[in-house]
């Protein structure tokens, strides 16, 4: 999803993600945050396989430790070190608005840089309205909450789950229980009542649909 959004932003600028030389980097909270790090690792694998023409100009990544002010400072440091960078991926809801604010401070917009990542619609709408980015994503928090409540009630009712089980959640669909290792390399999973259930869908926001969401 992150790479797809980056590609869409590049194409909006007339850059061919498959054939043009593209420079990019990652800016998020820190390498020890399981979900964010797993997204970065998965994204790198996609880039390596499908976009060998992309160059990561900061393989050690940029980290702002979920600090809003630091996210702006680090964001400005990224742009100072790589003023012609094509893509900045912010797989963290604090890093993304900070990077966007840094871009505005330095005179960038969606026509000369592609910044994308994960954050709530309300946190980013202003930057999108300003023309600083083309798209960003997350998930529908209502669906997330409904899944969490249903699974909690399902197990509280005495049901036992294990990796490989498929749970049918009304109004959402069939969801498979995955091993913890699916999001955290080397993580153990207990035999029962343990594992990961992923949201069946994620959401991509643009100027066209961002006002359909209020969270």
What residue ranges belong to the model's regions?
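A residue-level marker of the well-folded mature domains of exported/periplasmic proteins
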Residues: 1-215
């Amino acid at each position: 999803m992150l790479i797809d959004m980056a590609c869409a932003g590049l194409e909006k600028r007339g850059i061919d993600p498959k054939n043009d030389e593209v420079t990019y980097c990652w800016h998020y909270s820190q390498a020890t945050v399981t979900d964010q790090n797993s997204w970065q690792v998965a994204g790198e694998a996609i880039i390596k396989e499908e976009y060998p023409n992309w160059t990561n100009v900061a393989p050690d990544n940029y980290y702002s430790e979920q600090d809003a002010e630091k996210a702006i400072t680090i964001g400005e440091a990224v742009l100072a070190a790589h003023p012609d960078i094509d893509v900045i991926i912010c797989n963290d809801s604090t890093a993304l608005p900070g990077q966007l604010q840094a871009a505005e401070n330095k005179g960038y917009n969606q026509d000369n840089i592609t910044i994308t990542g994960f954050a709530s619609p309300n946190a980013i709408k202003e930057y999108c309205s300003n023309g600083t980015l083309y798209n960003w994503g997350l998930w529908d928090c209502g669906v997330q909450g409904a899944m969490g409540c249903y699974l909690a009630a399902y197990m509280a009712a005495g049901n036992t789950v294990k990796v490989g089980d498929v749970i049918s959640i009304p109004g959402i669909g069939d969801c498979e229980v995955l091993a913890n290792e699916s999001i955290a390399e080397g993580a153990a999973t207990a035999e029962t009542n343990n594992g990961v259930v992923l949201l069946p869908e994620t959401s991509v926001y643009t100027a066209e649909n961002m006002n359909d969401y209020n969270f």
